Amino acid sequence: MSKTLSFKTYSAKPGEVERAWYVIDAENQVLGRLAAQVATVLRGKHKPQFTPHVDTGDFVVVTNAGKIALSGKKHDDKTYFSHSHYPGGAKFEQAKDLLQKKPEKVIEHAVWGMLPHNNLGRQLFKKLKVYAGPEHPHAAQMPVEMKVNQ
């Protein structure tokens, strides 16, 4: 931004955005609350230079996805739908089964539902990295640990 006082609305440019890396431990975190905070950081709404049509967000690494908490009876009742695009290709999977097979998909599905469903949303979603265990290969980026608001 310029050093003089200006009363014009600031609009971020893609080249000016500085990106940080955050790591979030999902162990015993409620899925919806975690996904909402992750989506906010991915969009960049926590920054003062947030611009709705520009990717101003940061990278987020979520670890321990297999130890996420679902409130209420969602562990047994929640179902995930997918379709193979062939007749009779509908597939329904319970949350408890998906948490055992692919725990990353549960968090990715929740976060994707909170991002815009357009080109910008797809670009934002690529900055989300989810891992089932406590280890991740992004130590070189020096991610800062972030706590989830309860």
UniProtKB/Swiss-Prot annotation:
GO terms for biological process: negative regulation of translation; translation. It comes from the Bacteria. Coiled coil: none annotated. GO terms for molecular function: mRNA binding; structural constituent of ribosome. Keywords: Ribonucleoprotein, Ribosomal protein. InterPro entries: Ribosomal_uL13, Ribosomal_uL13_bac-type, Ribosomal_uL13_sf. The keyword Ribonucleoprotein applies. PANTHER family: LARGE RIBOSOMAL SUBUNIT PROTEIN UL13M, RIBOSOMAL PROTEIN L13. Belongs to the universal ribosomal protein uL13 family. This protein is one of the early assembly proteins of the 50S ribosomal subunit, although it is not seen to bind rRNA by itself. It is important during the early stages of 50S assembly. Part of the 50S ribosomal subunit. This is Large ribosomal subunit protein uL13. The gene is rplM.
